[in-house]
């Protein structure tokens, strides 16, 4: 696997935005780069500033709030954002659900709450993970399949220049089947 390190989300976007058109493989109706891994060194600097991204902070916040409700209903996003974007309208099933909604997947078996409790109880655990994709639910993914499969949380030591532990940091490893550049 190729692993790149970037200062922030914008630097990662800029790299892939410049690389995929030239090095990506024609795959189905897109360009793809497989087996990519990267680290964002400053995850709190997560806003992509490249104008090509056409990033809408209000929409991003609304979508995040929707996930946090745990509701798979596209209508819930509409109530938060003021409208239901076409992409989500197109992905709804017959009940108005977006089955790949991360929030409803996190809430399955209270996964997010369990991860927080695990890390509080034992910061050294390597079992603090959330499964987004559930193979038993594959028939529900008729209209949409989650891009993110799993998220693992690990507390790792932050080592200073002298080799001593300065602090602990929460590391998040995300495993995805697909990640849209746009």
Label each region the model flagged.
Residues 1-182:
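Terminal, non-catalytic protein-protein interaction segments that mediate quaternary/complex assembly
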